[in-house]
Amino acid sequence: MVAVVDMGSNSFILLLQHEGETLLEEVYEVGLKSIEDEDEAFEVASQVISQIKTKVQNVPIHVFGTAIFRERPHLFERIVRQFRLKGEILSEEDEAYFTYMSVDPSFEKSITVFDLGGGSLEVVRKDWFMSLPLGTHVLNRLFDLSLPEIRQFEEAVKHVESMLPSFTNPVGVGGSFVAIASMKRGKWDLKAVEGFVLNWSDVEAVIERLRGNSFEQVRGWNVIPAGREKTIVAGCAVALAITKHEPVKVSTKGFRHTVARMLEEGGIQRPWARSG
């Protein structure tokens, strides 16, 4: 049995796995990208890690930092040291390909994986990847996407479109895609949204439902995790830019599933680096 924590800019995600079977998967919203003070960010992260350690006892916990911790490695080191955790900060390449492998573990498919976090958007094919500064917190800083008005949504969509590479068969990974699909379905159910296909009209419908409602009202719908209401509009901007070209298939997986499988099998491997 192994416990893996994906420590992201928007959220920390706990995955408890045994022999390839998911026993527990929980999302904890943290919003670290919007917290500039390191002590405050450490306190928020520590509260979540404390909850996780209480919930997962007598199981080794492996933590993996992504974009926010590539920017702030000292914060990651403080957390790991404080809680005596095993962990590492993933490079952009590692994060991209581990995420890709959660969808296509054998590198056989002709797909483009879009992994949207708070700090970046990873675009990954089986033989190529790029990291774009299009995370939800980044877009929130660049544009006024605040509820209820959502004043600069169209501008945000155009900005994303201008930076996207060409792609085919898109797969959307990350809490924002899951949240949009959940809003469309009316409830948060990871099994139900796995493989859900979002088209542009679905994303438009979610935006229209959000428009005119406050953060508190959206949170009160109890459809998406508390805190996600602050980033879902930015997520819709990315999703709409993608679905204008092709519908996107939603995946609830992520790099945590790949590294958990590898840890159970004996250790982390990087097959894309063998020729390097």
Language model features by range: what are they?
Residues V2-D6, I111-D115, P170:
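Short glycine-aspartate micro-motif
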Residues N10, V59, T168:
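Short acidic/polar active-site loop segments enriched in Thr and Asp
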Residues M1-T22:
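N-terminal basic/disordered segments at the start of proteins
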Residues G20-E29, V56:
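N-terminal glycine-rich anion-binding loops that anchor highly charged ligand groups
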Residues L16-H18, V30-K53, H62, A67-S110, ...:
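Helical "lid/coupling" subdomains associated with nucleotide-phosphate turnover
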Residues S9-S11, V103, G117-V123, G175:
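Ser/Thr-glycine-rich phosphate-binding loops at phosphate-binding pockets of nucleotides
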